[in-house]
């Protein structure tokens, strides 16, 4: 396997260059070429002597970029990339543009073990977790494909980030320090893994010096019974325990928790569900992000009507819960929330 340089800090690259018998400035050049100029391989870094570049490649060292397999653009300009890893696995990442920002939805694993019924990613199971450079590459690949600097990052692609917390936190450090994306513009989404939330804040403080990224917890139901129907792994994490761990995260970091809630027509979208949800999450600083269901082939769930969605939102609002509705982006290219999977679609835009 290639020894990847992507994902390393400026200090680490400088130390690495010195260990290779080079001057410290070579490490600074390497950092600039990898992060600012977007070098895909050592061959691109023309300021380095050819003999040294060749020797490094011979020794199994390279930048560590992924290969773009497919590139599709939705009618709303949302861009989905299918990327291939060195061992032949594939992952998807999505660039979501607006006039003011470019959000990159990154994957943290190849596949996902959580098997949420409404999500396409979990249908294929988990292959492995991604390494730090494979996570960071997704942001660089979207920047390259869309010719625009990403402003926000959401760990809402393939995989459960808290089952790969070490690589995810190191990727956050890299995105923050090396690509200049503020932690407050980074969101880490989790469906909830027992014992990981209490550790996350402490680990982030150790690894990052602070924990300023947003934690988004996927609830998708107002009670334990319904949550277990939608999320098979929820049986191991009682609803009350999950909320208590969210309160602990808030106490340690001072950062409010965002709760994700996918609305499924006739299943969890009734006014009584909204009232019950308000009773559960209204007791501490939080925010509810409503997401209308995005269809996948394997399930027959229905997307609620706009009227039903608005009624649900109003119940939460009247009960004092901060709430917003996430717009679905990239639907016509299966690039919306819950639709990512490891597959190549018919050609759309050449890579």
UniProtKB/Swiss-Prot annotation:
SUPFAM superfamilies: Radical SAM enzymes. It is found in: Cytoplasm. The keyword Iron applies. Keywords: 4Fe-4S, Cytoplasm, Disulfide bond, Iron, Iron-sulfur, Metal-binding, Methyltransferase, rRNA processing, S-adenosyl-L-methionine, Transferase, tRNA processing. One of its GO terms (cellular component) is cytoplasm. S-adenosyl-L-methionine binds at residues 159-160, 189, 218-220, 294. Specifically methylates position 2 of adenine 2503 in 23S rRNA and position 2 of adenine 37 in tRNAs. This is Probable dual-specificity RNA methyltransferase RlmN. The gene is rlmN.
